[in-house]
Amino acid sequence: MDDHKPIETPDGPAVDTPGIGARRYETPPTELPITEAEAARAAGLAHNEHLKIASGYLRGGLADGLLKHATGAISEDDGQLVKFHGMYMQDDRDIRAERTKKKLEKAYSFMIRLRIAGGVVTPKQWLILDNIATTYAGSALRATTRQTFQYHGVIKSNLKRTMAAIDSALLDTIAACGDVNRNVMAATNPAQAGAHKIALQLAKDISDTLLPKTGAWREIWLDGERVVGGEDAAEVEPVYGKTYLPRKFKTVVAVPPSNEVDIFAHDLGFIAILDKKNRVTGWNVTVGGGMGMTHGESDTFPRTADVLGFVQPEDALKAAEAVMTVQRDWGNRKNRKNARLKYTIERFGLDAFRAEVEKRIGKKLGAPKPFTFDGNGDRYGWVEGEDGRHHLTLYVPSGRIKDIEGGPQFLSGLRRIAEVHEGDFRLTGNQNVIIANVPAGKRAEIDALVDEYGLTRGASALRRNSMACVALPTCGLALAESERYLPDLLSELEESLARHGLQDEPITIRSTGCPNGCARPFISEIGLVGRGPERYHLYLGAAFDGSRLSKLYREDVTASEIKGTLDPLFAAYAKDRQPGEHFGDFVIRAGFVAKTSNGPDFHERTGPLRAA
């Protein structure tokens, strides 16, 4: 990762940021008690801030809106609040024009996202989630890029039934979306059982500590006793306050040498520092990563996280709360496009941010400890852990767990496995599923079911390192296809790679339908970001381990032009690469594309530097 070292000037801290020259940071705000801070932010707030303040701790008009059976929708304002409850209101864009022509309401439905810290569920929970999918969500589950499940296509009249079923699995959807700390990811490396256990526990502890305390979720969705008038005088959010956070906040826990959680793409991260016996001795804390941006607005950009410092195990939770509450108090509540933690750090500087975090923890952070990542992909097939348990990673294209006509029967097959499995299931940040903690004596039974249902233990090197967001037809932000388009593109590129003898070369490729970056395309060696129907920006040059951003190589490339654009680069890579050199590193060294040091210079020196 590229380090940024602030320098002192007579007028205060400044940073030499590649591409934009030296600049001065803003002076951080004076810390206020949260109630005073809310009052101080009363002027000039973004609309969402007023919504949160007036919502009665996230109740709004949701309960009443569910009773309006004449429409499949809820109000626009409640559509913002319902995100905090773990769902988005969507419609089927494939039939939107047809329904408009017939003067019909849009085909509204809801995407529901679960909160599953670390992505681990039991076989019993899996079977309940499977039943929800077949009953309410079109017989499909989707493993997300952040280690949880999503249901698509749940209609309004089935929302409460779905939530009750989720609750019966001892799971929930609280804070899976919205301006809060969202689902906390954790390393899934099956070979490091001891470290994984500690990482998973930290993820769960952070999730519980930073969880909103409002009773609104249980009241609205499970018919819990409703407080008269919404909230009562005694109800508080001790960490968040009425305005919660300025924007989404994402936390991950990584265990080197694998970076499958993409730690540098998140607001807050903890990197396990291991001794020679793979025991966790503490955590490096990372801050300020994030993928989203807006096309054509150079003051928005993706950013890789900085390493803030080192904490002992007993201080990790304090550090998590301190980082989040500094963002709560310093983040931009007037412009949501610049509200993420990455912009807060760019405004005030890493040194000032670190000082405030240390103040809230009550002690200095240690110097960062050395660590090494070797990639951000999964390990497919069987892996034996330190404890003698066995783990089978299955490749699930775009995380879509459903039965495919003439192909793998993911939903049915994993249901059968859950009926006999004695361990647990783990979701990965790459949208795959691990059948975990299998006793040696059960491997043959699991293998037989995997074969019977055609489940995939792997695929080509390119497919194994690919990801796509949902995009069309359900995502309201999508500008282009992603999940439905990527398989065809991969087939084209596989042919090209094979022609150049690169069929076994791991290259990360990710696609998103818009620049919000849900599949983290800006830290993928090849990134496709939707611009319009069948048009994409093509990004190249990210690091294979996810530690360096890519650079815009070609604008508005049509779907039919992508293979032809990449083929000469593959040819050059096959001919001129150095031993062990990854594709993202090669295109920079060979002079095809400029290197991005970090977010502020992401939009500088774009385009091809020379012909391929």
UniProtKB/Swiss-Prot annotation:
GO-annotated cellular components: sulfite reductase complex (NADPH)
Gene Ontology MF, one: sulfite reductase (ferredoxin) activity
Keywords noted in UniProt: 4Fe-4S, Amino-acid biosynthesis, Cysteine biosynthesis, Heme, Iron, Iron-sulfur, Metal-binding, NADP, Oxidoreductase
Binding-site residues, [4Fe-4S] cluster: 469, 475, 514, 518
Positions of siroheme binding: 518
Family: Belongs to the nitrite and sulfite reductase 4Fe-4S domain family.
Name by which UniProt lists this protein: Sulfite reductase [NADPH] hemoprotein beta-component
Gene responsible for this protein: cysI
